[in-house]
């Protein structure tokens, strides 16, 4: 029972990752290359004649050591004195945590490790981090072995970069105790989100919550002010449920339906739909996995009732969800995202660079949004290391990473404030249609590139989430 319950938790908890779009190994990300083909062939931009936007005479941005609008990311140099674990005169060891080897969900967050491998191959081709070869240590937590992987990393790694684990509070502070720094791809539990010695490139704070999607839909559907929330009562989803309810109430929504479904074997979907209809629900959010949302949508279709709009977290931007649930989907189903969908590669050079990076340096690897989020951590680490120069240290990495203003990973995602406490003010709207996931420019009302950046896109939360509030 513990294994089954935790397996379901692994599925649902991933909704907490800021822009996570995870899936098992046999699933494909929207906009990514189909199985057996290369991501770069599928979505290369039409820039300078070579599909990368760079001049043919000089090669792509990657050939020049750049990524998006970042230049000279990795390069040769004269390494300084090695004084910390994982740092030698010739190498720098970086650990990437995933749950890809879990028996319950094979391939979970595989894309993060695959991005790490691709980054290291490209970076080392250009001289490494200040002349040091990047060595990626594979820290596969397999859901239940996070504590063991942290113990290993404490003995071998200079930093954790670009990874994450579903049960990321299992080490009980061991990472911090050994002085190991972390630039994670994502953090899930409240304890992990506020942990010391950490800079999140795409922050998932506890006491700030991205409200852009609700704000946009509130403007588009002002009459839809009766919210229904359906969720599964497991550790991670229970936190995001509480955050959504607090945010919605602060925005003026009346939460008239707040129910839990069973993590395994739920059959009462029509009953939920009937109760939502009877309770007058006009706005709806479901917290969990796409498979359960498909079952609920089918029940809505059978009952002939849909809410005025449905808002979902970014983990629903999934090809399997579209394949199985597209025909029963409401016409007004939306989500917000800090990352553009893959079919915008022609408009977003850094997105094209990510696809090219994977095609060239890890062609068998998975391309997915969480892979991009992990890559943001590696790019932030490299930029910070460049600023540290010969005086490379863990303390310097944290200082320089946290000092980056408007971090976009070269344009890969919206502007972020690296750290643990500040949610992005910049998002875009995705409309889930029967034909796929589409950037909704009209709903987004972009004011900075393709994004809407507005202070009102974030709500400050005041309820107690069991961890200290950030210092003023």
Where are these regions (language model features)?
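Beta-alpha junction/loop-to-helix N-cap segments that form part of ligand/metal-binding clefts
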Residues: 27, 107-114, 125-196, 261-267, ...
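Extracellular/periplasmic ligand-binding modules, especially the Venus flytrap/periplasmic-binding
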Residues: 233, 241, 245, 290-293, ...
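Solvent-exposed, acidic/polar segments of extracytosolic/periplasmic ligand-binding ectodomains
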Residues: 45-81, 407-472
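Extracytoplasmic "Venus flytrap"
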Residues: 77-90, 95-117, 141, 231-239, ...
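C-terminal motif of bacterial Sec signal peptides marking the signal peptidase cleavage site
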Residues: 17-20
């Amino acid at each position: 029972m513990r294994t089954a319950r935790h397996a379901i938790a692994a599925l649902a908890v991933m909704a907490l990752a800021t822009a996570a779009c995870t899936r098992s190994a046999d699933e494909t990300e929207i906009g990514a290359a189909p199985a057996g083909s290369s991501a770069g062939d599928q979505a290369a931009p039409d820039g300078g004649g070579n599909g990368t936007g760079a001049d043919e005479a000089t090669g792509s941005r990657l050939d020049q050591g750049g990524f998006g609008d970042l230049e000279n990311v990795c390069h040769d140099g004269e390494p300084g004195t090695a004084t910390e674990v994982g740092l030698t005169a010739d190498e720098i060891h970086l650990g990437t945590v995933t749950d890809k080897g879990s028996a319950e969900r094979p391939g979970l967050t595989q894309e993060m490790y695959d991005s790490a491998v691709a980054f290291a191959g490209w970076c080392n081709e250009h001289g490494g981090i200040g002349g040091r070869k990047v060595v990626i240590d594979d820290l596969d937590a397999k859901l239940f072995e996070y504590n063991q992987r942290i113990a290993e990393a404490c003995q071998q790694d200079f930093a954790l970069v670009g990874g994450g684990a579903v049960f990321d509070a299992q080490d009980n502070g061991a990472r911090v105790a050994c002085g190991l720094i972390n630039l994670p791809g994502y953090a899930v539990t409240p304890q992990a989100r506020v942990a010391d010695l950490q800079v999140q490139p795409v922050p998932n704070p506890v006491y700030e919550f991205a409200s852009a999607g609700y704000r946009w839909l509130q403007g588009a559907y002002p009459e839809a002010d009766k919210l229904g929330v359906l969720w599964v009562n497991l550790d991670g989803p229970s936190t995001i449920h509480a955050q959504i309810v607090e945010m919605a109430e602060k925005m003026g929504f009346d939460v008239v339906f707040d129910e839990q479904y069973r993590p395994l074997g739920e059959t009462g979907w029509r009953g939920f739909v009937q109760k939502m209809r009877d309770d007058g629900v006009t706005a709806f959010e479901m917290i969990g996995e796409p498979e359960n949302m498909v079952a609920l949508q089918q029940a809505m279709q059978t009952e002939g009732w849909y809410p005025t709009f449905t808002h979902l977290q970014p983990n629903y931007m999934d090809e399997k969800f579209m394949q199985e649930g597209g025909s029963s989907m409401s016409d007004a189903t939306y989500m917000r995202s800090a990352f553009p969908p893959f079919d915008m590669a022609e408009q977003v050079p850094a997105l094209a660079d990510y696809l090219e990076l994977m095609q060239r340096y890890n062609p068998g690897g998975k391309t997915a949004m969480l892979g991009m989020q992990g890559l943001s951590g590696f790019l932030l680490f490299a930029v910070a290391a460049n600023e540290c120069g010969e005086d490379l240290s863990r303390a310097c990495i944290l200082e320089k990473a946290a000092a980056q203003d408007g971090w976009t990973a070269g344009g890969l995602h919206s502007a972020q404030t690296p750290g643990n406490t500040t949610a992005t003010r910049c998002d875009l709207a995705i409309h889930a249609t029967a034909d796929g996931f589409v950037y909704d420019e009209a709903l987004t009302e972009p004011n900075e590139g393709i994004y809407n950046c507005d202070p009102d896109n974030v709500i400050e939360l005041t309820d107690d989430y069991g961890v200290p509030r950030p210092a003023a």
